Amino acid sequence: EEIKVFAKHNCGVAHCPTSNMRLASGIAPIKEYRAAGVNVGLGVDGSASNDGSHLLAEVRNAMLVSRVKEGLTGYSLSNDPNRKLMTAREALYLGTRGGAAVLGRTDIGSLEVGKCADFFAVRLNQLGFAGMHDPVSAVVFGQPVRVDYTVVNGKFVVREGQLATVDEGRLIERHNKAAKRLLAG
């Protein structure tokens, strides 16, 4: 019923799989939302329920949780190899174009002429990617990596794996001091 209401009123859903797992909030019906035409994007929630705030981890967890949900119905690749499971590309879609659709933004979500130049890049010449045949699957199925480059609106914010717009060491120092003050009351 809820899914029909979302679709009827053009509501979008921010799926936060890591937060849902941490809080035991259940498994969102992403396959059903998408089949009904509901826009689904990914979120990291907040530090109260997701300390990592790593969008690639959310992409991976969205895919894996959707597969766990299918498994809870008794499905297994070994008993039905033709059943449709969320793919790495579909999960990456949720973290890019899906998020843009939820926000009603047509200027982000994909690399196209006239859109904001927002993208990330990962060097694939690492041991964790050795033998890969599909770079998207390698990045999504593998352990979440620290990206080598991130560009937001045409400007580098991560370069060679380091924040390019702030002094990362100073930021960590300030963050740790603030956390100690909060804990001290």
Positions of PLM-derived features:
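A general structural motif
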Residues: 1, 21-26, 102-103
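C-terminal active-site-proximal or functional interface alpha/beta core segments in diverse enzymes
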Residues: 16-27, 52
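Extended hydrophobic-aromatic, low-complexity segments
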Residues: 24, 110-112, 129-132
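C-terminal cap of metal-dependent C-N hydrolases
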Residues: 116-172
